[in-house]
Regions:
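Glycine-rich phosphate-binding loops of nucleotide-dependent enzymes
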Residues: 1-170
Length: 170
């Protein structure tokens, strides 16, 4: 129904077919994806796209690359914040991402996105193919991020769990 395509258009990964994409009253319709990330928009796509040959730690560092000239102390602070959200990632910080379970990869994908310190976090089907206990852990983290002031745009098939943490549903 075009949900993923809409997220991709907001992210600058595909051209919008028509209309404008506004962020804080600024037209970002024709902006490049890296610029959109620098403006505070993060898109965590469906399918747990991690860098399999990089460690958990290296994946998190990669998430901060769009943040130009981020001081090393701030980079470490953001990594520690992700380890607080997902303690399991800290335990596996030197593990190659490709050897992790699907749930752990999803945690890493979300945490890597949060490394850019977004104002808007867009999540596309974060529970897809995951065990119920992992889904609960991920949604608890999403709720913490939302309560900390980050706007979350969530595309999710599991309506019951999504509605539990939502302010609005469409």
């Amino acid at each position: 129904a075009g949900k993923t395509t809409t997220l991709m258009a907001i992210s600058g990964l595909v051209d919008a077919a028509e209309g404008q994409i506004l962020l804080d009253d600024m037209d970002i319709t024709d902006c490049r994806p890296n610029s959109i990330v620098q403006m505070g928009v993060c898109h965590v796509p469906e399918g747990r796209h991690v860098f399999p040959e990089l460690s958990v730690y290296e994946n998190l560092v990669a998430g901060a690359i769009p943040c130009k000239k981020l001081p090393r102390a701030e980079l470490q602070n953001r990594i520690e914040q992700q380890f607080e959200l997902f303690p399991r990632l800290k335990e596996r910080s030197s593990q190659m991402a490709g050897t992790m379970s699907g749930g752990e990869q999803q945690m890493l994908a979300i945490s890597r996105g949060l490394m850019s310190n977004p104002k808007l976090l867009m999540l596309d089907e974060p529970s897809l193919g995951l065990a119920p206990i992992i889904v609960e852990e991920i949604f608890n983290m999403i709720e913490k991020v939302r309560k900390a002031g980050t706007t979350v745009l969530l595309i999710e098939q599991n309506a019951s769990i999504a509605l539990q943490i939502s302010d609005y549903a469409y």
